[in-house]
Each structure stands twice: as C-alpha cells, then as structure tokens.
Amino acid sequence: MNAHPPPQLRQLTRPDEVTPRLREELIDCWEAVVNSGGAVIAAEFPLPPVSRTDVAPVVDGLVRALDPGLGRMLVATVGGALAGWLVVRRDRHPLVAHRGAVNHVQTLPRLRGRGIATALMERATAVAREEMGLERLAIAVRGGAGLEEFYRRLGWTEVGRWPGALRVAPGDDRDEILMSLVL
C-alpha cells in the first residue's frame, strides 16, 4: 500500500490558465530541481546554480507557447501545491506533425519517489495519443542520472545517443540519450 496520496493531475492548454500562484510555483520547482542536480537545464540557463531571475523568463516563454494543438502543460499537485510538471508539444510542419516531444519533466526534490513523475508521464502519453492525435513521442535525457531506466520502465526505447554532448561541469561530460515511444 502506498503511504502517499496520488497526485492530482491537471492539463493547461492556454496561457490564461496559469495563475500567478502557479507561475511562482513553476519557477520555484524548476529552480529547486536544477540546484539539486536535476537534469532539466534549459538552453537559456547558465550552469547551476540558477536563480529565479534565470528561470522566470523561460517559464514565461513556455506559458506563452501553450496552445491546445501545439503545446500543453501537465501539472501534478499534492495537497493543493505543485509537486511536478512537464510539457508536451508538437511541431506544425507536416514532416513531423505526427510526432511530439515531452520536455521539462520534473518533480520537487523533496517529493521524489512518490510516483509523481510516473503519473505525469502516463497522463502525457494519454494526452498525446487521445487528445493531440500524436503517433510517437520523443524525449532527450541526460546520461549518468538513471533517467533512461525510468523511461524504459514506461515503455520508451533508446533510439540514439550523443556521446559527451552535455558538459555538466569541467571534466564531467555526459551522453545525451534520445528516446522514443510509439503511441
């Protein structure tokens, strides 16, 4: 029996659905994840540690991009507070419009191990298939953090690897692992 209640999941499809409180929680979550060693570093961020000043404009950009057909945010809450989140998106171009990508998968460090990321990923898969009409999802994960095993358990397959593509710190290069899930 799980001692922790399951997270409540909610899907956001438009910028106006993100309240000021949720915006602050998204920023706090991402800052905490990155500064605890999490592998969710946006291209716009400096190397860790990051601050709210670094994170806020990236969150704002993700929120502005929310659109029912192109980009959705899934949030997980526990006890009414944000516990984790991710983004599912697709490209409009006809060559790739049948597939989407999952990005920014994260849970608050203090709430890890409670099935929050699993619940988010399972819901993302259903949303992508049933609501967005996608046929395949892609994700890129940092090697050396055990993430590829997490995704494998959820049915994802490694389809490529860029050796040493991610420099986490001087002398600490990690592979970027490309994974795919057929829906």
Write out the residue ranges for each language-model feature:
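Short, low-complexity, intrinsically disordered N-terminal peptides in bacterial proteins
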Residues: 1-9
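Glycine-rich acyl-CoA binding loop
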Residues: 113-121
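Conserved acetyl-CoA-binding loop of GNAT-fold acetyltransferases
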Residues: 152-162
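Conserved beta-strand-loop-alpha-helix junction that forms the acyl-donor binding cleft
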Residues: 112, 137-148, 165-170
